[in-house]
């Protein structure tokens, strides 16, 4: 299964690290490029923007959002909603 992961703090990066060895493809993004590079070294596909993340995901897309609750999460879900299409899924973690 292919999954987009937005937010690579402790929880998001550890989720991706658990999914990768189980054979899942993770396409990852974080505003901080460091954890993106770390996960690329572990087999994830890194991206530098939400646009690039959405572009690299196959339809129907599934994107797991692991950013802090509140305005940041609301804005991220809103921004993804503008880029995704009917049939795509956002998981707000």
Residue ranges and their predicted role:
Residues 1-65, 83-93:
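NAD(P)+-binding Rossmann beta1-loop-alpha1 motif at the extreme N-terminus of oxidoreductases
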Residues 65-79:
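Beta-loop-alpha module in the N-terminal Rossmann-like domain of NAD(P)-dependent dehydrogenases
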């Amino acid at each position: 299964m292919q999954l987009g992961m937005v937010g690579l703090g402790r929880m998001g990066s550890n989720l991706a690290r658990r999914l990768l060895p189980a054979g899942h493809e993770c396409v990852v993004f974080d505003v901080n490029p460091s954890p993106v590079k770390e996960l690329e070294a572990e087999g994830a596909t890194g991206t530098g923007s939400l646009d690039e993340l959405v572009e690299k995901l196959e339809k129907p897309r599934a994107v797991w959002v692991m950013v802090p609750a509140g305005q940041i999460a609301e804005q991220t879900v809103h921004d993804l909603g503008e880029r995704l299409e009917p049939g795509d899924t956002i998981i707000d973690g």
